[in-house]
């Protein structure tokens, strides 16, 4: 067995111990928890950014792409698919958890394929955000509203051909809808002069409008992933003083949005009957990988500050993993594959934590 295989086996066993899977809360689950954590979903629809993009940006005129090595080195066949990792994304692991196939990218499907797929589609687009103007400087972008537009087209042009009206209503009501977007709004549009509260309110307004659109289209079960601690990611910590410390001001700004989002979802459970929200606290999960405080590296086994690609990352000068970039030999020793995105191992760790720790993923209840 080579070093890479040994590390894979070692870390998987280690993670099972660290996450203490056997200590799941044994109290009787709520009805919503039974549905969202153990539901038999017919389909999985994904809306978001590069965290969950499965290849839509391959088909866009944009500088943000990952359809080249060393991306995908640990994916099936070692192929770069357009996922921003060395392997699977968190959306992939969620699909696997629910017994569904990996969700294909909308723009990579032929019309015939769109007509035949009934287990879900991925509309996520790297570099894009909640606001329409986010990411325009890097090329064509599929904003949150555009992705919802595409889902509406899926209903009109494809799903209606496969389902009777009552069947389609049931299909949509029983399917799971994941939304994982918002970090690029902070990356491109937020700075030290921006009022964090006003900015969060602006994002939230547009975000909730799109949830309402999805609900009107028939969605009833949502998986809402909050925004990551951007201030602790390699592209940021490489430029902080002291180097490696988080930008706490940026994290605080993001946390304002996350808090508002969670409260708004709680109110929505009262507004929308028979609608459930599973809230994923991705922010605190990723922050927790660093250790007890945001400026303390919490693991001697995993590199939590530097990316695997590029392997040489000096002061933020190399800001992306590009064609020809040399990656580290063992991605499973890193939390981040590139300066902006987690490794497959980190995504796998998240999936375990999400479905076995209610502090990470939990059903939103009424206030």
Curated annotation (Swiss-Prot):
Signal peptide: 1-26
Family statement drawn from the similarity comment of this UniProt entry: Belongs to the 'GDSL' lipolytic enzyme family.
Transmembrane segments: none
GO terms (BP aspect): lipid catabolic process
EC category: hydrolase
Organism: Arabidopsis thaliana
Main location: secreted
Enzyme Commission code: 3.1.1.-
Sugar-bearing residue positions: 25, 191, 303
Name of the molecule in the record: GDSL esterase/lipase At2g03980
Cellular location(s): Secreted
Entry annotation: catalytic residues: 50 (nucleophile), 338, 341
CC annotations in GO: extracellular region
Gene Ontology molecular-function annotations: hydrolase activity, acting on ester bonds
Keyword Protease belongs to the record: no
């Amino acid at each position: 067995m080579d070093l890479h295989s040994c590390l894979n086996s070692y870390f998987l066993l280690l993670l099972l111990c660290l996450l203490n899977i056997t200590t799941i809360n044994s109290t009787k689950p709520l009805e919503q928890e039974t549905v969202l954590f153990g539901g038999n979903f017919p389909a999985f629809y994904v809306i978001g950014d590069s965290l969950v993009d499965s290849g839509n940006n391959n088909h866009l005129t944009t500088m943000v792409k990952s359809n080249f090595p060393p991306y995908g080195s640990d994916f099936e066949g070692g192929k770069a698919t357009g996922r921003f990792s060395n392997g699977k994304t968190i959306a992939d692991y969620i699909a696997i958890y629910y017994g569904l196939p990996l969700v294909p990218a909308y723009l990579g499907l032929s019309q015939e394929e769109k007509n035949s797929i009934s287990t879900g589609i991925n509309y996520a687009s790297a570099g894009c955000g909640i606001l329409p103007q986010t990411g325009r400087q890097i090329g064509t972008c599929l904003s949150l509203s555009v992705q919802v537009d595409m889902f509406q087209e899926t209903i009109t042009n494809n799903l209606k051909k496969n389902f009777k009206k009552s069947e389609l209503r049931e299909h949509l009501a029983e399917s799971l809808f994941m939304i994982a977007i918002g970090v690029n709004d902070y990356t491109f549009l937020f700075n030290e002069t921006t009022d964090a509260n006003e900015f969060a309110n602006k994002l939230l307004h547009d975000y909730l409008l799109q949830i309402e659109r999805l609900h009107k289209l028939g969605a009833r079960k949502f998986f809402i992933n909050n925004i990551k601690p951007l201030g602790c990611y390699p592209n940021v910590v490489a430029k902080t003083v002291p180097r490696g410390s988080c930008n706490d001001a940026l994290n605080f700004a993001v946390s304002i949005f996350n808090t508002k989002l969670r409260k708004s979802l709680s109110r929505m459970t009262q507004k929308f009957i028979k609608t459930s929200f599973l809230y994923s606290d991705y922010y605190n999960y990723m922050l927790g990988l660093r250790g007890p405080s945001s400026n303390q590296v919490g693991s001697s086994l995993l590199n939590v500050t530097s990316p695997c690609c590029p392997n040489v990352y000096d002061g933020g000068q190399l800001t992306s993993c590009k064609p020809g970039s040399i990656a580290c030999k063992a991605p499973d020793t890193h939390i981040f594959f590139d300066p902006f995105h987690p490794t497959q191992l980190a995504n796998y760790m998240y999936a375990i934590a999400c479905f076995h720790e209610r502090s990470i993923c939990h059903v939103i209840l009424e206030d």
